[in-house]
A protein has these predicted regions:
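A helix-boundary/hinge signal
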Residues: 1-191
Length: 191
């Protein structure tokens, strides 16, 4: 619905702005805001694993709603493979969810992408990949270029070639989140 001031949907726009703040926290773990939030809300985990908790401030609860947009609109770029969970994270070019799906015979054990590399090398271990995945996903994984210098894995914004976060595309991701019912009434009322 268009408003008279050119705003299409204020709730989606607000959610996109919260997503931008979450994106900044993800991209700059050395920032003062990241350090303060880590000390208070996720001292023993990573930002990606952070939960709301029972004593969440309005700010923290709002940022976690922005996280939902980032999770839908971002993918991982493989670097050293230490941060990406093979089964749970978005890292292969396979819409709609960009995730590897476990074949029935594979046990769902936590595994990071680095376990798919040759021992001591930045090359795919094709035997291990073929053992764990279906033909289509094996082909997609083997096409992913690997860093020769072992850079860290990086979260990139999927809608933009350079991987930079854009409010415009975050707005459309926020609309998807809201329309799917992922932003349920209980979350809105608690903010």
């Amino acid at each position: 619905m268009d408003g008279g001031l050119g705003f299409k949907d204020l709730e989606s726009f607000n959610l996109a702005l919260l997503a931008k703040q979450w994106w900044r926290l993800v991209q700059n773990e050395r920032s003062l805001s990241h350090k303060v939030l880590k000390a208070k809300y996720f001292p023993y985990s990573t930002l990606h694993q952070a939960q709301k908790g029972s004593k969440a401030s309005y700010l923290w609860a709002s940022l976690l709603e922005g996280k939902r947009v980032v999770e839908q609109g971002a993918n991982w770029r493989v670097g050293d493979g230490k941060s990406i969970n093979v089964w749970n994270d978005r890292w292969i070019k396979k819409p709609p969810d960009f995730k590897v799906h476990k074949p029935d015979q594979v046990q769902p054990t936590p595994m990071h992408v680095e376990r798919l590399f040759q021992n001591g090398k930045m090359e795919w271990n094709k035997e291990v990949i073929r053992e764990l995945m279906g033909e289509e996903e094996t082909s997609l994984v083997e096409k992913i270029p690997l860093s020769k210098n072992g850079m860290a894995d990086r979260l990139i914004w999927k809608e933009y070639v350079l991987g930079a976060f854009l409010i415009k595309s975050a707005y459309y991701e926020a609309r998807k989140v809201l329309n799917k019912g992922n932003w349920d009434k209980s979350n809105r009322d608690s903010l």
